[in-house]
Each structure stands twice: as C-alpha cells, then as structure tokens.
C-alpha cells in the first residue's frame, strides 16, 4: 500500500497544506522546528487516530484554531481508499470511503504504518507502558478485533476501579460479576498478545541474527501478572490471580493484575537486553522494526508504510545499509532529515520536499 495524497488543515504548525507523494521514497528536508516531524505525525495520526508524541489531542490543533482535519488517499491492491479524521474539542470523527466509522476497530487497519524514531530506544529501557503501547499500536493495525477486545477490557477495568474507589461497602457478588467480565476480555487480549509476540520473535530473531553478523540471538518474552504457561487454562489462572489480589485491590482501590500490568522483555543470547550497549539497543530496535514490516506483510499481504524520523544519522553504515535494503524494496518510505549528507545511497526514485515554517515544497525527484 502507499499514501498517494495528504491534506492537512490546522494540524500543528500547518495552516492548510495539500501534498502528493512518491509511491517509493519521500524525504522531508529542513531545519529543526519547521514541521518535518509534524508531517510524519500527521501520517501516523491518519493511520491510527493517535499521536506517537502526545496523549493530549488538543495539542495537535493549530494554536489559534478549534479543530483540525486530515484526509488522505491510500492505494492498495484492492483499489483506492479515502481516509478522513476530524478532531474538535468534542472528540474525533473518522471516515472510510466518506462513511463515518462508529468504532476505532472499523477504521484502524486501512492504512498500516511502521514508525522508527530515536525515542524508540525507550522500547528497551523505558517504562512497561511504552512496550504495552507498542503492542497495542502494531497489533491493532493487523488485527482489528484486538482493539475491540482491548476497548472492552479497559471499559470493564475502569468500572472495577471506579467501584473500588467509590463503594462504601463492597458487594462481593457485584465485584465477582465485574471480575468475570474482566477475565473474559482480559484473556482475549492476552491471547492476541501472546500470538503476536510469538510471530514477532520469529521474524525478529532472523533479522537480528543478520544484523549482528550471526553472533547474537534475539528472544522476546511476554511478562504477565497472570500465569500464562498453560494457555488452555488461562481463564482459570486469571481468576485465581484476581482472587489472590483482592485484599490488595480493596486496600489500594485499583486492580493489581491483568494485561494492563503486563510487559515484554527482550533478550540477547539469553541475557536481558536492557543491560546491553547502545549499539546493541539500536540493532535490536532496528531488527524489531524490520520484523514488524515482514509480519504485517505476511498477515495483510500489503506492505506497510515506513516512517523514519531522523534516524539515519543515528545508525552506523551496517545498519544504514540494512535499512536501505528494505527501502529499496516495494515499500513506501518517508524520511525526515536536516541534511542530505548521510543519505548518499538512497534509491534514485525519490521525491524531496523542503519543509519550512509549516509549508512543504517539492524541490527534487
């Protein structure tokens, strides 16, 4: 798939911009704070209805406006798909083929993206919430039912936590009803995640072995607050975990176990990767990103769109060449950079856009 056209209206520092893209490589060139990353963020937001930089949607709206509008035309094997997002103070409206979508799971997945940015190194050493978000964003694109199950789980979780905080006297029967619903959707979420991690590890192990000159083996482990060793009895394991945590939950007035507390760990040759060198971290994250691309292709039969936010200068020659191999294949790529000096080996079929003060101008093909 590839993004043919993008229209931005009052998004970040873009007042109104319309731009047509190259199906292969697109380079956003400009000084810092001109809007290069904002352009990538717009593409990411159009795909996922979420920003990778802020949790507060109103930060995306131009400072003197009350709403924003994004639209794009995605080309896929099955034809063209127009996508639209309108964000106001009241919320967001999403449209596919000009038809309003009632649920997030009905919208996400029509345009798949893989983002690689310097902050992705936090995937290794950052907080567990960063890794959970990574799973949610990637898995949600290839398996829409996951977003539906996750939304339902979070709804029940919020209900349970609110009840724990507000109830003067706990009704054990009512709490058990909430627990049953939490277990139902929680097990679905965990099963989706376990399947995803297994596939990601398979692709990632191969990529990392190549990047490390056949000396490092990558493995990924899903760390759960629930006993996940026996998937057939996952529901029973979750119930037992909730029962054991009930006294703690009543005291702290929140839910201590479940997929909202889970994490993933990365290992290099059996050792915790968080203790590795910065070079190993870069290789590991690059391996994961390249694995994401192959995983998405294997499931959707479409190549995702690759977004590279100022990462080429962060990579050594070996890692750059590996990334360029991927770019040279049939995958649309967007790169932000302040200079073309370290992009000498890029494919010839590319478009360069100069970004200045929230405006984009084509200056090379």
Swiss-Prot record:
Predominant location category? cytoplasm
Q: Name one GO molecular function term.
A: ATP binding
| Keyword 4Fe-4S attached | no
Q: Which GO terms describe its cellular component?
A: cytoplasm
* Family annotation (Gene3D superfamilies): P-loop containing nucleotide triphosphate hydrolases, RecF/RecN/SMC, N-terminal domain
Q: Which GO terms describe its biological process?
A: DNA replication; DNA synthesis involved in DNA repair; double-strand break repair; SOS response
Q: Which residues bind ATP?
A: 30-37
Sorted keywords for this record are: ATP-binding, Cytoplasm, DNA damage, DNA repair, DNA replication, DNA-binding, Nucleotide-binding, SOS response
Superkingdom of the organism of origin: Bacteria
- Spell out the subcellular localization from the entry: Cytoplasm
Is Iron included in the keywords of this UniProt record? no
Role according to the record: The RecF protein is involved in DNA metabolism; it is required for DNA replication and normal SOS inducibility. RecF binds preferentially to single-stranded, linear DNA. It also seems to bind ATP.
Record family assignment = Belongs to the RecF family.
Do you know which HAMAP family this protein is assigned to? RecF
This protein's name = DNA replication and repair protein RecF
Q: Which organism is it from?
A: Streptococcus pneumoniae serotype 4 (strain ATCC BAA-334 / TIGR4)
Give me the gene this protein comes from. Answer: recF
């Amino acid at each position: 798939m590839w993004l043919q056209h993008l229209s931005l209206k009052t998004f970040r520092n873009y007042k109104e911009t319309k731009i047509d893209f190259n199906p292969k490589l697109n380079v956003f060139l400009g000084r810092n704070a001109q809007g290069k990353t904002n352009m990538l963020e717009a593409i990411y937001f159009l795909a996922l209805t979420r920003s990778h930089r802020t949790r507060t949607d109103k930060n995306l709206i131009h400072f003197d406006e009350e709403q924003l509008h994004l639209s794009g035309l995605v080309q896929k094997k099955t034809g063209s798909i127009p996508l639209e997002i309108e964000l106001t103070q009241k919320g967001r409206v999403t449209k596919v083929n000009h038809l309003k979508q009632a649920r997030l799971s009905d919208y996400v997945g029509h345009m798949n993206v893989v983002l690689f940015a310097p902050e992705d190194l936090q995937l290794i050493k950052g907080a567990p919430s960063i890794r959970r978000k990574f799973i949610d964003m990637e898995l949600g694109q290839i398996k829409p039912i996951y977003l539906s199950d996750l939304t339902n789980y979070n709804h029940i979780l919020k209900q349970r936590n609110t009840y724990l905080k507000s109830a003067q006297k706990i009704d054990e029967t009512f709490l058990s009803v909430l627990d049953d619903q939490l277990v139902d959707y929680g097990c679905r979420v965990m099963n989706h995640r376990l399947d995803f991690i297994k596939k990601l590890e398979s692709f990632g192990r191969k990529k990392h072995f190549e990047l490390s000159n056949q000396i490092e083996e990558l493995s990924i482990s899903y760390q759960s607050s629930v006993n996940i060793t026996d998937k057939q009895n996952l529901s029973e394991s979750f119930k037992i975990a909730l029962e054991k945590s009930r006294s703690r939950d009543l005291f702290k007035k929140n839910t201590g176990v479940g997929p909202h507390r889970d994490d993933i760990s990365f290992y290099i040759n059996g050792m915790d990767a968080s203790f590795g060198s910065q070079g190993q971290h870069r290789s590991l994250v690059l391996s994961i990103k390249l694995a994401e691309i192959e995983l998405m292709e294997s499931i959707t039969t479409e190549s995702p769109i690759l977004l590279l936010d100022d990462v080429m200068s962060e990579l050594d020659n070996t890692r750059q060449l590996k990334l360029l191999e991927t770019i040279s294949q049939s995958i649309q790529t967007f790169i932000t950079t302040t200079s073309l000096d370290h992009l000498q080996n890029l494919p010839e079929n590319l478009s360069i856009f100069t970004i200045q003060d929230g405006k984009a101008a084509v200056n090379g093909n």
